[in-house]
Amino acid sequence: MAARLPPGNQRHDGEYEDLLSLWSDLESALSVVLSAPLRVQDFPAKVRQVDRWLQDLVAHDIDAALYLMFQLASTSSVGYSASHALVCGTLCHIMAQELQLPPRERDSLVRAALTMNIAMTALQDVLAGQREKPTAAQQDAIRNHPQESQALLERLFITDNLWLDVVGQHHASISDRVPLASQEPHDRLTRILGTIDRYAAMISPRKSRAGRSATDSVRAIAGHEVDQRDEVSYTLVRSVGLCPPGTFVRLDN
């Protein structure tokens, strides 16, 4: 899974295609891991491998990474769930750098982002292509999936308690108007992941609705004026921007 990248200052159109191919390969590898996790040999090592690959691609060129990731998300052939996981994992990695999280917290955050919906991978793909409202059974699965995902990861020999805790509570409501540094690590990471999860879901089109613009998505989460006390939304806007590379914007005229 080693990513071989062209030098940042010597990139041409053909090399962008090479980079897009690398992102596509990464997305496909993640899809395999998430689609049949119980059949993956040494699941923890595979997730770490995907994480290292992601870090290599982002380190090469962050703007190119954002552009290609968002382009891939809108044309993904592997299913919504893996595409959403990759977007969340990438944005969490970028946010961890911006927020200067300790390496252990960064690793737990990104790996939680990649696996938070692992108990409902197939259902998430179905829902993305479903025009009707979720059935009662689907609603139950949606409601219970954080705990089910945590339990599945434990079966897969994940022993990082911070990773497990964040997955298990990733839909919990965590105060976003207190300093991140004052929160416990599991609450701090849950707060970051929750914001990224909502943002990534809003910009992704589904059969039941079109994706929002990146600008509208940020404003839906943080309001028209981003409160600097909401460190996560503020950092998201500062690091990714209201109009990230590779996303569509709606013009006033």
Regions found by a protein language model. Give the residues of each.
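Acidic/His-rich, divalent-metal-binding segments that scaffold phosphate/diphosphate chemistry
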Residues: 4-143, 150, 154-157
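Alpha-helical scaffolding flanking metal-ion-dependent phosphate/phosphodiester catalytic sites
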Residues: 88, 111-123, 130, 134-234, ...
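Tryptophan-centered motif/residue detector
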Residues: 23, 66, 162-163, 248
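Terminal helices and disordered tails flanking the catalytic cores of nucleotide-processing hydrolases
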Residues: 1-41, 48-51, 174, 203, ...
